């Protein structure tokens, strides 16, 4: 595994890739996730980073080999992407494009909240992960008037079945729940949570009304 080229990445592209590694930690083991959350992103240890990239590659390789046609466990790799793709699409439509990994990181915030309320994901691990995202990725800003637009974008995600929004959620780190759904009210509640915990209410036009 050749990781020397990681040194050439600017900060934004580094964090974009790191978001996928964070996802791998969430679908792997508590130890793997803890290492990712503890990594010093301001003073990068490239030797340690190389070993962490290797672990991420192993996680993805194991899943893809087990389910090459994505009929089952490979859907675990979609964690954070259902909402993340909607954020990407909205950002592009508004001519404020974002890197894929940033959208995934923000999507993880939303989908960990769904995991917390629907499948019992531990609140402390949700909060730890959200804090890491908040500190390293900032936030994607939107207001409540855009909830319907985001919802419609999510309905058109290629991973859906028969028009039903499909989520990959977690009961615990590494305990994956595939093919999960949520009604519109719950999804809007998820957006409320995201905007509150990420500080978006401070920057959007409807803040005074809420």
List the model feature ranges, each with a label:
Residues 34-148:
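Active-site segments that bind and position negatively charged phosphate/pyrophosphate groups
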Residues 1-39:
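A glycine/threonine-rich phosphate-anchoring loop and its flanking beta-alpha core
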Residues 66-68, 91, 187-199:
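Catalytic, metal-anchored helix/loop core of enzyme active sites in primary metabolism
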């Amino acid at each position: 595994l050749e990781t020397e080229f990681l040194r050439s990445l600017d900060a934004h592209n580094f964090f974009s890739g790191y978001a996928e590694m964070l996802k791998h930690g969430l679908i792997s083991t508590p130890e793997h996730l803890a290492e990712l959350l503890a990594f010093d992103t301001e003073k990068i240890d490239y030797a340690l980073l190389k070993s962490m990239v290797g672990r991420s590659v192993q996680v993805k390789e194991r899943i893809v080999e087990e389910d090459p046609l994505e009929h089952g466990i490979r859907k675990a790799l979609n964690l954070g992407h259902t909402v993340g793709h909607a954020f990407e699409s909205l950002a592009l439509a508004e001519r404020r494009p974002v890197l894929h990994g940033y959208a995934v990181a923000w999507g993880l915030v939303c989908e960990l909240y769904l995991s917390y309320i629907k499948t019992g994901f531990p609140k402390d691990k949700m909060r730890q992960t959200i804090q890491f995202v908040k500190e390293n990725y900032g936030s994607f800003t939107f207001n409540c008037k855009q909830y319907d637009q985001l919802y419609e974008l999510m309905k058109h995600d290629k991973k859906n079945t028969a028009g039903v929004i499909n989520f990959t959620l977690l009961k615990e780190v590494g305990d994956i729940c595939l093919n999960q759904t949520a009604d519109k009210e719950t999804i809007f509640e998820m957006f409320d949570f995201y905007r509150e915990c990420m500080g978006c209410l401070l920057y959007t036009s409807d803040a005074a009304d809420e």
